[in-house]
Amino acid sequence: MVSLDPINAKFAAAIDGLPAPHQLGGPGKAFENLEELQRHEPANDIATQVIKVEGKYGPTSVTLFRSKALVDKPLPMIFYTHGGGWVMGSAKSFAVLVEDLARRTGAAVIFPDYTLAPHQTFPFPFEQSYEVLEYMIRHGKEYNLLVKTIALAGDSVGGHMAIAMMQMSLQRQLPATISQIVLWAPVTVTHKKYPSYTTFKDGPFLPEATMDWMIDTFIPSKSDRETALASPLTHLPDDVLSKFPPTIIFLSTVDPLVDEGVAFGQRLQGLGVDASVIKAEGQMHAFCLVTALRDGPTAQAVLELAALRLRKIFPDSA
């Protein structure tokens, strides 16, 4: 029997009986609910800069997070794609996590506010996010960024998108080297379910029905789900996946996505990729993001390890 640690158990009890995202009355209400849950005063030590990236898929709002102590220095770049089921999430609701990464790594974290479903569906936000990634690489000097070697990071469906960014960068020859990927509970397959969907059918925080609703909203076409972008675990070719850089995958033991995260890590390992899979015992989905959970000892240890792996490729960062 998998159990939650005291911090996660307390939060699970607090939300028990409350409507899940798919029960709130539509994507707009779900978005508002997450924004309220994650209401956060901007950190005093982190500077933010909001820019607009024009282009075929824009304009896209992009927020750059960096330590105020390093604001005048050229900084390495982490490109972060956020979770929220492709229907929720913003630079505001994810600020507490992204600020932490900027603080711990000494890097600039680039956060695209891609268009959420149902306003745009698969694959538009993937193309939109890649457009931002390529723009930041080509215009890095304008924003005091060091872009020769960069990292990708993302959580949940944002991890799904980070995998897509890597795939697209290889196929389209992004003029930069991606040297590290950091993933939290990534979605890696959308056309089938692994056993943990049944094990954690009722959550907490991410029940099976919510995940089903998110996939149906973002990828309504079932044929689209059986593609490399939508289901990299089962459809991304070996010759592409084998070119992935060192990748670390953090998983929660109480999460419907845990099994597909393990399977993706094992597939990377089988192809010779330097891939690490780490399960955080007693944690639920989004334990490094949710304000009520992220100060727990396990979440803090995971964030410390994530930052360590990121700093490893940025030898000149703080």
UniProtKB/Swiss-Prot annotation:
Gene source species: Gibberella moniliformis (strain M3125 / FGSC 7600)
The entry's keywords: Hydrolase
UniProt similarity note: Belongs to the AB hydrolase 3 family.
Entries under Gene3D superfamilies matching the protein: alpha/beta hydrolase (3.40.50.1820)
Top-level taxon of origin: Eukaryota
GO MF annotation list: hydrolase activity
Outcome of gene disruption: Does not affect tolerance to 2-benzoxazolinone (BOA).
Taxonomic lineage: Eukaryota, Fungi, Dikarya, Ascomycota, Pezizomycotina
Residue numbers annotated as active site: S156, D255, H285
Matching InterPro entries: AB_hydrolase_3, AB_hydrolase_fold, GDXG_lipolytic_enzyme
Keyword Hydrolase: yes
UniProt induction comment: Expression is induced in response to 2-benzoxasolinone (BOA) exposure.
Reported function: Esterase; part of the Fusarium detoxification of benzoxazolinone cluster 2 (FDB2) involved in the degradation of benzoxazolinones produced by the host plant. Maize, wheat, and rye produce the 2 benzoxazinone phytoanticipins 2,4-dihy-droxy-7-methoxy-1,4-benzoxazin-3-one (DIMBOA) and 2,4-dihydroxy-1,4-benzoxazin-3-one (DIBOA) that, due to their inherent instability once released, spontaneously degrade to the more stable corresponding benzoxazolinones, 6-methoxy-2-benzoxazolinone (MBOA) and 2-benzoxazolinone (BOA), respectively.
Enzyme Commission number(s): 3.1.1.-
Name this polypeptide is given: Esterase FVEG_12639
UniProt KW Hydrolase keyword: yes
One Pfam family this sequence matches: Abhydrolase_3
UniProt miscellaneous comment: Fusarium verticillioides possesses 2 unlinked loci, FDB1 and FDB2, necessary for detoxification of antimicrobial compounds produced by maize, including 2-benzoxazolinone (BOA). The FDB2 cluster arose as a duplication of the FDB1 cluster with rearrangement and expansion by incorporating additional genes.
